């Protein structure tokens, strides 16, 4: 018997709206469960970012940097920056934004997103029943 497509794990987009602090540091992003493959991750600015000397961000779970040194300096509202470095998250974790800032951009609202697949087993094979052995 074929496995129904609706029973299989699928890629989904998870997101969280956060406000990046006005100074360099780590901002907690989306939560992902154990056994998750991250295919891509990134940031979307919800307002314009001022032009300062340096404003870069890493989207990371602490082990894998999914989007490395994406520039947010002078980014327009709704600018999407992404990285496509895949990574496996073995234990439940968060995908955070680590910023490097030189200047004073102020607090910046953003949407942190990731395309993920839960790769834990999702389907259990059917057990044999009497009708399968009668005939």
Where do the language-model regions lie?
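Surface-exposed, low-hydrophobicity beta-strand/loop segments enriched in small/polar/acidic residues
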Residues: 1-135
């Amino acid at each position: 018997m074929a496995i129904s497509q609706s029973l299989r794990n699928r890629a989904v987009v998870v997101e969280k709206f956060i406000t990046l602090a006005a100074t360099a540091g780590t901002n907690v992003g989306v939560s992902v469960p154990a056994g998750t493959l991250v295919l891509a991750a990134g940031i979307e600015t919800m307002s314009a970012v001022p032009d300062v000397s340096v404003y870069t961000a890493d989207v990371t779970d602490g082990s894998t940097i999914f989007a490395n040194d994406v520039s947010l300096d002078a980014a327009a509202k709704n600018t999407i920056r992404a990285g496509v470095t895949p990574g496996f998250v073995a234990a439940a974790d968060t995908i955070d934004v680590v910023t490097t800032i030189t200047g004073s951009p102020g607090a910046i609202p953003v949407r942190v997103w990731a395309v993920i697949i839960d790769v834990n087993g999702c389907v259990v094979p059917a057990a044999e029943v009497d009708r399968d052995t009668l005939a």
